[in-house]
Amino acid sequence: MNNKLTVNVDKTKLMLFTPRSVHNMPIVQYNGVVIEWVKTIKYLGITIDENLTFVPHVNEVTKKLSQLSGVFYSIKYLVPRTTLLNIFYSLVYGTLIQNIIIWGGNSEVHIRGIRVRLNNILRSIMNVKVGDLDTNDLYNALDILKYYDIYKLFLLKLVHFCLYQRPDVFQEHFFHLMPNDRYPTRNNKIKLPQIRLNIEKQSTNFNCCKVINEFEN
């Protein structure tokens, strides 16, 4: 290649993004080596699946939080709460926020496992059992946002970044401002994108528009 880049065939995979099952995929070769077709692949820290549901990634996050929950339970008597909180923000919070704007809008069926394990970890930090402390009080006591609040926070950060720190082309592509009938000089509503499939309600674009409108209300 002219730019002196070479393809690492051993790390190269093929994936077809489609909502339907496709069989008998064509054989693709590069320099005589057959490239493998895959249904999921990890790229830049996120597991991408052929249907773009990001459920495999959610499952990986759930599994990691489950392992960390066991760690917190084991060490809660050994280290002070401040240390537990430092570990929480380093390992748990860091895992949660990584690419959350991409996969965080998944359905509650899949997200519930993350929320349950997050609650368990915070109970270990506070050294309380289930029922000893209301969930809202648990988060308030540690000054930690709940899962969906974390997701909304990062969506709002993305909206602010696109609206105020990027060229107008970002606004034109991602967000369509609607005139305010009550205050004509304001454009504080964003039109929700048209969707054809339920899975599109999980998209970053749809949820960015939704959360900014809720925030304005």
Which residues are covered by each model-predicted region?
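Short, conserved catalytic/metal-binding micro-motifs enriched in Asp/Glu and His
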Residues: 41-51, 65, 92, 96-104, ...
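Amphipathic alpha-helical interaction motifs in eukaryotic regulatory proteins
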Residues: 1, 66-69, 73, 93, ...
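Short, charged alpha-helical motifs in flexible N/C-terminal segments and linkers
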Residues: 1-15, 110-175
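Acidic, serine/threonine- and proline-rich low-complexity regulatory regions
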Residues: 73-85, 102-107, 133-146
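Short, conserved micro-motifs composed of acidic
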Residues: 2-39
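Amphipathic alpha-helical
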Residues: 168-206
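Basic, alpha-helical interaction scaffolds
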Residues: 33-102
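Short conserved micro-motifs at the rims of enzyme active sites and ligand-binding pockets
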Residues: 26-28, 54-58, 167-168, 213-217
